[in-house]
Amino acid sequence: MKHYVLVHGGCHGAWCWYKVKPMLEHSGHRVTVFDLTAHGVNMSRVEDIQTLEDFAKPLLEVLESFGSDDKVVLVAHSLGGIPAALAADMFPSKISVAVFVTSFMPDTTNPPSYVFEKFLGSITEEERMDFELGSYGTDDHPLKTAFLGPNYLKNMYLLSPIEDYELAKMLMRVTPAITSNLTGTKSLTAQGYGSISRVYIVCGEDKGIRVDFQRWMIENSPVKEVMEIKDADHMPMFSKPHELCDRLLKIADKYP
């Protein structure tokens, strides 16, 4: 039996794994899902998030609660890749493999914010649509928020069932934009995050994080293996849940 820990993306929550969780459990595995700070039904506000550690706190608490011999398959989607990478840096001995599903994936050279800030710089005004950036924090420590409006969200859910898109519209929450002011300027370590096995799952019809940007992140920080779900949009847990579970089961078998 493997133990999967599933990390949701920005503005979403543990709810987005509702199709994948029972499939993995039906295959005989243990699955842990949770809400990141100020997401899903977590009662914190985005203003409570002053550091990347604050954002990742529920994930860090989950990993901390496991025994020293417990190893998990850490699966991160979209913006969840950055708090997941921090968790892997802090608890490398508890990670058998980290799986980045069309996800922001830091390196060990730049600050963890580097890939997200690079992404923001790569999208045009036309592509940005109603992807809204806001601000909070103080003059000394300015921070940014991000929110996925219904038009940008629709692009992310392009091949997903309409019901899942409607559900997402109802459940969206403001997320912290992962800037260097949030993460600090230090990179994740080669001894921690850099020492774990990583696999990247490319989603071939993703209009949220384009395929060329997914491929750039893989070039920027090479992984053990790259898999692809050709007909998946940005939300493979909705558009291609069976294919996603198939990849996750194969990965868990390969990286004990």
Swiss-Prot record:
UniProt enzyme class: hydrolase
* InterPro entries listed in its UniProt record: AB_hydrolase_1 (IPR000073), AB_hydrolase_fold (IPR029058), MES/HNL (IPR045889)
Disulfide bridge positions per record = none
How is it regulated at the activity level?
A: Esterase activity is down-regulated by salicylic acid (SA).
Question: Which EC number(s) does UniProt give?
Answer: 3.1.1.-
Q: What more is known?
A: Expression of MES9 can restore systemic acquired resistance in SAR-deficient tobacco plants.
Q: Which family does it belong to?
A: Belongs to the AB hydrolase superfamily. Methylesterase family.
Q: Can you name this protein?
A: Methylesterase 9
Organism expressing this protein natively: Arabidopsis thaliana
